[in-house]
Amino acid sequence: MSSERACMLCGIVQTTNEFGRVGCPNCQGIFEEAGVSTMECTSPSFEGLVGMCKPTKSWVAKWLSVDANIPGMYAVKVDGRLPPEVVELLPHYKPRDGSQVE
């Protein structure tokens, strides 16, 4: 059984222990402002992995909307829904589960 999870907001993939210890390196401030735990905003169900070494220079990072995030492994699709408290803080939020068609 995999202990990896993906953030439902930015898509970064880390172990459950990493999310539990330090939270999401890209989104933790938003989760704290919303008053929700990191585990509520991560999912063990995700598809595809993309390694980002230089997100600011990557067209794939721009396509995944992670070009402003830290280098790391990112999921292409993350199943699940963010808590409404988080979504309310993000006027331009696009779900990473593929439910919103552009």
From Swiss-Prot:
A zinc finger (C4-type) spans 7-27. GO terms for molecular function: protein-containing complex binding; rDNA binding; RNA polymerase II complex binding; single-stranded RNA binding; zinc ion binding. The keyword Nucleus applies. Its main location: nucleus. It is found in: Nucleus; Chromosome, Centromere. Keywords: Centromere, Chromosome, Metal-binding, mRNA processing, Nucleus, Transcription, Zinc, Zinc-finger. It comes from the Eukaryota. GO terms for cellular component: DSIF complex; kinetochore; mating-type region heterochromatin; rDNA heterochromatin. GO terms for biological process: 7-methylguanosine mRNA capping; heterochromatin formation; intracellular mRNA localization; negative regulation of autophagy; negative regulation of transcription elongation by RNA polymerase I; positive regulation of transcription elongation by RNA polymerase I; positive regulation of transcription elongation by RNA polymerase II; regulation of rRNA processing. The keyword Thylakoid does not apply. Component of the SPT4-SPT5 complex. Interacts with RNA polymerase II. The SPT4-SPT5 complex mediates both activation and inhibition of transcription elongation, and plays a role in pre-mRNA processing. This complex seems to be important for the stability of the RNA polymerase II elongation machinery on the chromatin template but not for the inherent ability of this machinery to translocate down the gene. This is Transcription elongation factor SPT4.
